UniProtKB/Swiss-Prot annotation:
Pfam families: LexA_DNA_bind (PF01726), Peptidase_S24 (PF00717). It is an enzyme of class 3 (hydrolase). It comes from Rhizobium meliloti (strain 1021). Its EC number is 3.4.21.88. The record marks A123, G124 as: Cleavage. The active site is at S158, K196. This is LexA repressor. Belongs to the peptidase S24 family. One of its GO terms (biological process) is DNA replication. Represses a number of genes involved in the response to DNA damage (SOS response), including recA and lexA. In the presence of single-stranded DNA, RecA interacts with LexA causing an autocatalytic cleavage which disrupts the DNA-binding part of LexA, leading to derepression of the SOS regulon and eventually DNA repair. It catalyses: Hydrolysis of Ala-|-Gly bond in repressor LexA.
Amino acid sequence: MLTRKQQELLLFIHERMKESGVPPSFDEMKDALDLASKSGIHRLITALEERGFIRRLPNRARALEVIKLPEAYAGASQVRRGFSPSVIEGSLGKPAAPPPAPKPAPPAEAASVAVPVMGRIAAGVPISAIQNNMHDISVPVEMIGSGEHYALEIKGDSMIEAGILDGDTVIIRNGSTASPGDIVVALIDDEEATLKRFRRKGASIALEAANPAYETRIFGPDRVKIQGRLVGLIRRYH
C-alpha cells in the first residue's frame, strides 16, 4: 500500500510523461507535491523503487522507468493488460521543461492513507534517534492534510497534561521549523530524539514537558534540530 505522497508522485510522473513526453525535474516534482525540499522527493522515489513501482536506470541522469501503477488508479486495467513503462530521461542539455502539469488527486474513494511508523520516541528522557520504518498504519485523510507525514509510538509520561499517554501513536508532519507552543519531535545533538513542546528562551531553545515531574531543558540552537510537529494522535483501547 502506497502512502498518499508516494501515489501522488507516481501518478504525477506517469501523467506528465503521457501528456508532454518531457520529464519533470526534481524541483518540479517538489513543487507539485508541496514539499519543502528535494530530499523528500528522493525518499519518495526510493520508497517507490523498493515497492516495485519504478526503477532507476543506471548511468542516465534522473532516468526512471514506471513499472506499474496503483490498482485504484483509473488506468489500472491498462497496466494489467500490457502496460508499457514510461521512461523518464534526465534533462541535462535539453530545453527547459514547461511548467508542471496539475498535481494528480488521490482516488476519491480513499478515506485513509498509509503512514509509516518509524519507531518509538520518548515523552520523557530522550532515547536514541528514530530512523527505522517498522510498519505502516492507516490514518484518516482529514487528520493529516497536506505535506509528508510519519508516525511514532510514545514511550513515557512527560506529555500527559497535553493528552499524550504512554503507548499512544502520534502523527508527525515532517519539517524543520516550528512555532513557539508547537509539540515537536526534537533531535538533540544528532543522537537523541524526544517529543516536547517547543519554546524560545532568548537565543536558546527550550524543550518543555507537559508534566510537572519533568524539568524544561534548555539548549543552544545549534544542538537541536526540529524533525516535525504533532498533527494527530491515535489511541487504542484494550
